[in-house]
From Swiss-Prot:
Family, per entry: Belongs to the ABC transporter superfamily. Zinc importer (TC 3.A.1.15.5) family.
Catalyses which reaction(s): Zn(2+)(out) + ATP(in) + H2O(in) = Zn(2+)(in) + ADP(in) + phosphate(in) + H(+)(in)
GO molecular function (one): ABC-type zinc transporter activity
Protein name: Zinc import ATP-binding protein ZnuC
Cysteines engaged in disulfide bonds, as pairs: none
PANTHER family xref list: METAL TRANSPORT SYSTEM ATP-BINDING PROTEIN TM_0124-RELATED (PTHR42734), ZINC IMPORT ATP-BINDING PROTEIN ZNUC (PTHR42734:SF9)
Gene3D superfamilies (alphabetical): P-loop containing nucleotide triphosphate hydrolases
Length: 255
């Protein structure tokens, strides 16, 4: 039984088609990474899944009793507003101190409860946002460009924490990124989106490949991997995805 089923989903903003006939499903406990260029409809897909936008065609079906946790791409907090992490996590549902402590521990920032939001680093703030999403004990965790603005080491650390969250809680994870060449090595599936589903498959884990180490750097603990784009079709609408040749070009450039 799937947690979420997306069947033939099409979205339009005015006269512009953002998504066309997208179908996918998320099973309990799996990690799915959606990759694609800017403007490919990734965030729109997430918004449709959480019910923030209505489909033009198709439907999104959520399993009975399935709960979602959502980490947005960005959240602006007034830096002049004095607010501790604990106070932020209590809004708006009034989470208990025990629930806050557990969520912060699961996000890997147990000691930040009394810290001011305005004083957090980008990586710490993303962990706090993750903790906020985990308070409700979601069946499916959705993350929209969760590592945007983080350096490579920070991104790898965050990905590793997501793997730990899945192991600890059993929740499924749906992550999106615009970086076609970087995905979680722990992903069960990778879906390439560019207005429609271009392709999907498992990511290649490349821990020992020197050219990929040169591209992604060291110290990532295998959390970053390369997804090779190999398509057997041509696109009849939207701009084309970044295919295998583009990936190879990036690798050569990095060397």
């Amino acid at each position: 039984m799937s947690l979420v089923d997306v069947d033939g989903l099409s979205l339009r903003y005015g006269a512009r088609t953002v998504l066309s006939r997208v179908s996918l499903s998320i099973a309990p406990g799996e990690i799915v990474t959606i990759v694609g260029p800017n403007g490919s409809g990734k965030t729109s897909l997430l918004r449709a899944i959480i019910g923030a936008v209505k489909p033009f065609q198709g439907r999104v079906t959520r399993g009975a009793g399935v709960t979602l946790g959502y980490v947005p791409q960005k959240l602006h907090i007034d830096e002049t507003l004095p607010m501790t992490v604990a106070r932020f996590l209590r809004l708006p549902g009034g989470a208990s101190e025990a629930e806050i402590d557990q969520a912060l521990a699961q996000a890997g920032v147990r000691d930040l409860s009394g810290s001011q939001l305005a004083q957090l680093s980008g990586g710490q703030f993303q962990r706090v946002m993750l903790a906020r999403a985990l308070i409700g004990k979601p069946d499916l965790l959705l993350l929209d460009e969760a590592t945007q603005g983080l350096d490579q080491r920070g991104s790898a650390s965050f990905y590793q924490q997501i793997e730990q969250v899945r192991r600890d809680t059993g929740c499924a994870v749906l992550m999106i990124s615009h970086e076609l060449h970087v995905v979680m090595s722990a992903s069960d599936r990778v879906i390439c989106l560019n207005g429609h589903v271009c392709c999907e498959g498992t990511p290649a884990v490349v821990a020992s490949a020197p050219e990929y180490r040169a591209l992604f750097g060291t110290g990532t603990g295998g959390a970053l991997a390369l997804y090779r784009h190999e398509h057997d079709h041509e696109h009849d609408h939207h701009d084309g995805c970044a295919h295998g040749q583009a990936t190879e070009d990036r690798t050569e450039a990095a060397e």
